[in-house]
Regions:
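Extended, well-ordered alpha-helical segments in internal regulatory regions
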Residues: 240-247, 292-295, 333-334, 340, ...
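C-terminal amphipathic alpha-helical interaction region
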Residues: 364-488
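Internal helix-loop-helix
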Residues: 1-48, 105-106, 330, 438
Length: 488
């Protein structure tokens, strides 16, 4: 939320002032222009606080949108903002906000980005508000009650009554949804990275436990084929989430700083990053959250009763599971994200008909599937070539489905659409990774995700070559298997 707020405010900072000639009188400003200049000054101060790493300087930001009538549907927002310039000279803002926020994320933050309805405007507007006034008093904010949550308890969530809260308008009246989407995109990317990192942490605990836990006959748990197969499936989903999450990070970097992002193994054409990000953000957030819950739950089970206990913090999978549940809830549940994704895929064109901007997805897939083809020889090269063909066939089928299906039909079957898209994009990224250096674990991941379609925990499809040794390579790495650090 803090990163998202910083990015949003950075888009409204004043440009550097042009130098004035000594012979030219300084320009005069209207009251509205003076107010806009004051807003930019306030935003610049807040932005500096948000990006600071100094503990006594830095700020955190909350995000207050959810209200009782609407939940995820912010169009039902009842909070109002009235233009009422203060006679004082402080920087508290010329707007007065009144309303009730049912969920306030980061209640202990120093500032907040919120939505409110202004008189005479059909849309919502976005506002910046400090939580405290310069006098030290709270800025019209009353905490009604703290929420009792399943997890993420160190991050307070509360119901708030806003009465006379002073605020600054961000952008134009009625364009709050467009403004707040900047924050939503970044928080959804953060959500995806949190999912991938939580999976990796849980899996690391499960792997470490499997290498020291001895069962009947003194056999180490990691050498039991069934347990090893389970770890391999968890590893596959963790890799899938990591690739998706950091593809979104890369696209976000390109969208914000196209000239400062170093080249990578992934082909993204200049100007297409923002469009790709628009489609992939809801997809990535939804899929990584689901896979995260599956892997962490399985990690708890992999430790048996020990996993269900409240352990020391580094090993506390019980808390990790509680905290991870929010990843599929906040910033859009799975169905909300699917609706958002389908809306992007079937968006009407301003000139009539449908906007086929989703063709950028096909261009990305085609170019990255073709990049580096033929660099690996032998069995691995043949496997990757089969995978490339399989991915492209599914994408062609998806394109036809998107082209011919109505918005209602695609939304109703949205979960299937979501996972088929995930199959294509994860498969493409796994293929790019495997071609990069021919790592056996990466090639094995392609075999399982693309050719065996193991996109969820549990056996899927027919048994293929790779078997137990493939499990070991995927989980513990080829080096460990070859040098005897892992023995079946």
């Amino acid at each position: 939320m803090t990163d998202g707020a910083a990015r949003l405010l950075s888009r409204h900072l004043a440009p550097p002032p042009a130098p004035h000639s000594l012979n030219i009188a300084p320009p005069t400003y209207s009251s509205r222009e003076k107010e806009e200049e004051a807003a930019r000054r306030v935003f610049k101060h807040a932005y500096g606080r948000l990006i600071s790493r100094h503990p006594t300087v830095r700020w955190t930001s909350g995000q207050w949108m959810t209200e009782r009538p609407g939940g995820s549907d912010v169009s039902q927002t009842e909070t109002t903002a009235t233009y009422a310039p203060s006679a004082s000279t402080d920087d508290t803002g010329p707007w007065v906000v009144n309303g009730y926020k049912f969920f306030s994320s980061a209640t202990d933050a120093d500032m907040a980005i919120l939505l409110a309805r202004t008189p005479g405007s059909s849309g919502l507007s976005a506002f910046y508000a400090p939580v405290q006034l310069p006098s030290g008093e709270r800025n019209g904010v009353r905490i009604v009650r703290l929420k009792e949550k399943l997890g993420t308890k160190p991050v307070p969530t509360a119901e708030l009554e806003l009465r006379g809260m002073r605020a600054w308008l961000i952008g134009k009246e009625g364009e709050g949804i467009r403004e707040i989407s900047t924050v939503l995109n970044i928080t959804r990317v953060h959500n995806s990275v949190s999912a991938a990192s939580s999976m990796r942490r849980a899996l690391a605990v499960a792997k470490a436990y499997s290498r020291v836990r001895k069962i009947a006959g003194g056999r180490v748990l990691s050498t039991v084929p069934l347990h090893l197969r389970t770890l391999a499936q968890m590893e596959l989903l963790t890799r899938a989430s990591t690739h998706l999450a950091f593809l979104a990070v890369h696209l976000l970097s390109l969208a914000e700083s196209p000239l400062k992002t170093p080249p990578t193994a992934v082909i993204v054409h200049q100007g297409s990053a923002s469009r790709l990000l628009r489609f992939l953000t809801p997809l990535t957030k939804a899929v990584t959250a689901k896979m995260c819950l599956s892997v962490i739950s399985e990690s708890v089970e992999a430790l048996g009763g020990i996993g269900y206990l409240e352990n020391e913090e580094p090993l506390n999978l019980a808390r990790l599971l509680r905290d991870a549940q929010v990843l599929a809830v906040w910033e859009g549940t799975t169905n909300v994200l699917i609706t958002d994704l389908v809306s992007s895929l079937k968006r009407p064109s301003p000139s009539g008909g449908e906007d086929r901007s989703y063709f950028v997805l096909g261009e990305f897939i085609q170019e990255n599937l073709g990049r580096g083809a033929g660099t690996l020889k032998g069995d691995s090269g043949d496997l990757l070539e089969k995978a490339k063909i399989a991915i492209w066939k599914v994408w062609e089928s998806l394109t036809e489905e998107i082209e011919c299906g109505s918005r209602e039909e695609l939304t109703a079957g949205g979960r299937r659409l979501l996972w088929r898209l995930a199959y294509v994009f994860v498969g493409t990224m796994l293929l790019v990774d495997a071609r990069r250096d021919g790592d056996k674990g990466a090639v094995e991941a392609v075999r399982r995700w693309v050719l065996r379609r193991e996109i969820s925990l549990g056996e899927r499809g027919r048994r293929e070559e790779g078997g137990i040794e493939g499990d070991a390579i995927l989980v513990f790495g080829d080096e460990n298997v070859r040098h005897g650090k892992f023995k079946l």
